[in-house]
Structure formats: structure tokens, C-alpha cells
Amino acid sequence: MIQVLGTSSGSGKTTIAMALSRIFFRSGYRVAPFKAVNMSLNSVIVEGEYEIARAQWLQAKAANTEPTRFMNPILLKPEGMGASQVIMLGKSLGKKTIPEYYEFIMNDGKRVIREAIDRISDDYDLIIAEGAGSPAEINLLDRDMANIYVSSIYNTPAILVGDIDRGGVFASIYGTLSLMPRPDLVRWIMINKMRGDASLLEPGLKKLENLTGKRVIGVVPYSENRLPGEDSFDYDHPRARGSKITIVRYPFMENYSDLDPLVYTSTGYNYVTAENASDLSDADLIVLPGSKNVFADLEYMRKNGIDKIIIENAGRAKILGICGGYQMLGQRITMGEISADGLGLLRAKTNYERTKTTRSVRYRVDNTLMSGTWEEGYEIHYGAVISLGGERMNETDKGPEGNVDANRLVFGTNIHGILANRSVFRFMTGRDIGEPEEYLRSEIDRFADVVKSSIDVADLIEYASSRE
């Protein structure tokens, strides 16, 4: 196992781990990605029913292996107010407060992480384990199971990645090594996101090596990529001037990965919030994405007049609701004794249930305006959407799914990844889309080539070979 640690969140651990997975796969290794604890609102269904972070799914793609629940044994999905939904081995344990989570991680969490590593080790030659945040959060060291706890299980070496683009990279690396437990497990240092001439760093790199006793394995240049993001900040971008596609960005928006087809086709889109709600009146396509708290996000839209603007434009613009967005477009949402009116644009209602639905689904778009071949998607939701009539949007292996309004301009579905469907993308945006799998392969290869040409891969392979 080789672990990829970072001096901070956003240092590039996820993409570096992805690139290394591809590099080692090309070198003939059976590689598995791993992240003990991931906090992310971007998740995907694997093995038909288990929920893991989309980042580990992508890393498994890079390793050319099937993703499993053991590659991300613990997933945290923030729900606000100091609580997160905890998912263990792909299944939800429900919402836990911070103290409840710490009790869980120190007991069941530690055991599950270790068992997951052992399970993967039986099937693969090499594990590329990604850390989380920084290993030097000194207020949390006894409860940090995502970083040094993982590498200390087998005393495996780590790469410490520093982000030079945000400045202060030498201090952040030296400070991390000074504060983290078991700095002896860090064997290599990597500088990431270098803009300009890397040779300018050489005096500093030599001094850093002398101060730390660690080898700088390489300097990776800054490289734009259009790969699926891990967190919401990966989808922050300058407003696309002139774009007629708007995404309603309510406070509890989740599954940003549904926007990936817009990203990798360079299709411009803009977010709409309370500050620029009037932009909806000029949109050709309005997307209501998933929501971690449908009731709160409905209230947000009502408080800021977003709901009225959407309703006013329902006969003019195309409107697509995905998962929580679909629920909000319906007539009513009920959770026990709590209920709220939806926007009333689709003939559907939602009843929330205790059991979470997590499943892969085969579907084909099948309605008056769109039709297509059978595709793979997935569902992640608590609410059961009940059709009250109207046309279905899709046919699935589980029966009819989704809803289309009478004017055939408002669409709702629980299927994540729906915009990757060629028929849907063409109808909604007026543009053609390529094969997503081919695009992913190409972009993974491109970034892996950048990393491979920038670091001493031979040193890493020599270590991996010595452990066989």
C-alpha cells in the first residue's frame, strides 16, 4: 500500500491518487483505490446497491477495476447543524451528531476500516490509499482514522502532497511534518499545481529535503481537468456569459456530479441563487438538482421568490428536476406529520420513508419527446415518488419512472446520471454528447501522463516491487 496524504483539503490528493492508480495499472499491477473516511455529497451506487463516494468510483475506473463498498468503507454526507448521514460499507446508518460520530468511529469505524483494507489486500497487488484533509489536525488526532491510522496498520509509506498554487507550500509541508503523528511514515514529498518554470523551485526543494530527510519525488504542473469533482467547490466556476442553462443552487444542493456532462462537454451553465433569481426568466433550461434537505430548500426558494419565477416560466423554458428536485416539482411532500406543498408542476407526490433507496437501475428514456437505448443509472433517495397521472419519463427494469407535464416542458426523474443520456442531453441542451466512458478514459489517461512525466515513477515502482 502507498498512501497519498495532503497538507490540506484541495491539495490534489484525489487526482494524484487517481493518476497513480492508472500508472500502476499500466505497469501491470492489480490496483485498488481506498479512502477510509470520505466526506462528500457526491456519491454513486456500486455492486447494485451500495453507496460510496464518487471519487473512489473514479479512482477504480483509473485502476481498471470494479468499484466496491470496501474501497470507501465510511462515507459522511453533511446535513447541516453539526450532523451528517453516516454510511458504512455502502449502507446508511442514519444521521449522527459529531459526538455520536466520534463514538462510532472509535468503535465500529476502526474495525470496519481495518477489515476493508484486509479484504482489498486479498484481491489486489497494490492499494493506493487517499488520506482526508490534513494529517496534522492536532485537535482531532485521536479520532482521525482517514490518515496515519491507515498507513500505520501495515507501516506503509506515504506521499505528502503540497499545493503550491495557493502559496506557502514549503511552510505547509514542513509544518505538516512537524505536527503530524508518525512523520516517519512519509517517504516522499510531491509539489502539486505548479505554474511556470519548476526549476525555480530547486533551491527550496533541496533545502526542504535537508530539513525533513524526505525525498521530493517531483513537481506536478498545474493542469486543468474536466474530471468529475468530489466536492461542491470543484463545481464552482466563473459565470458562463450568455449561457441559457441555469442550475438552482439551493443551500442543501447535493450530487453535483449530475452536472458532469455539462462540464466535460464545456457546455456553459450558471447557478441561480437568491441574489440573481431573475436570471431564470431568461433561461432555456432550468435544472433543479438533488437536495439533502428538500423541506429547507423549498422554503429557501419560497422565501426568495425563486418558486414563483420557475412557475411563471414553466410554459416557456424546459425544466428538469433530478431526485430532490423532482420531488419539489410535484404536488406535495410528506414526512410523517410534516408536509409541504411542492411547486405543483408535475402530477406526483412524495412520501418520505425510513428506509433509504440505493440501487443501480437499467432504464431507457421513453416518452413522447425522447426515446433511447437501455442505459445504466442509479437512485439514492429516501422519498418514494408516487405518480398521480401524466406521462412517464423513463421505462426501467423496475417499471415506469419519472414524470412529464402535459405541456411536455417539465420533467422529473430519480435517476442520477440522466444528463449523460444522449437523448436527454440533446433534447435539454440542443447539443450532442459523446460516450461518457470514452471521455473519462481519455481524461484519466491525459492526467496520468502529466503526473508520470513529472515524478520519479521508478522509485514508486521499486517500492511496490519490493513488497510483492
Curated annotation (Swiss-Prot):
The keyword Ribosomal protein is assigned to this record: no
UniProt-listed GO biological process terms: cobalamin biosynthetic process
Gene this chain is encoded by: cobQ
Residue ranges crossing the lipid bilayer per the database entry: none
Pathway: Cofactor biosynthesis; adenosylcobalamin biosynthesis
Species of origin: Thermoplasma acidophilum (strain ATCC 25905 / DSM 1728 / JCM 9062 / NBRC 15155 / AMRC-C165)
InterPro entries noted in UniProt: Class_I_gatase-like (IPR029062), CobQ/CobB/MinD/ParA_Nub-bd_dom (IPR002586), CobQ_GATase1 (IPR033949), CobQ_synth (IPR004459), GATase_3 (IPR011698), P-loop_NTPase (IPR027417)
GO molecular function: ABC-type vitamin B12 transporter activity; catalytic activity
Gene3D superfamilies associated with the record: 3.40.50.880, P-loop containing nucleotide triphosphate hydrolases
Family: Belongs to the CobB/CobQ family. CobQ subfamily.
One Pfam family here: CbiA
Keywords: Cobalamin biosynthesis, Glutamine amidotransferase
Name under which the protein is recorded: Probable cobyric acid synthase
Active-site feature positions: C323 (nucleophile), H416
Residue intervals of the GATase cobBQ-type domain: 242-424
Its job: Catalyzes amidations at positions B, D, E, and G on adenosylcobyrinic A,C-diamide. NH(2) groups are provided by glutamine, and one molecule of ATP is hydrogenolyzed for each amidation.
Domain of life: Archaea
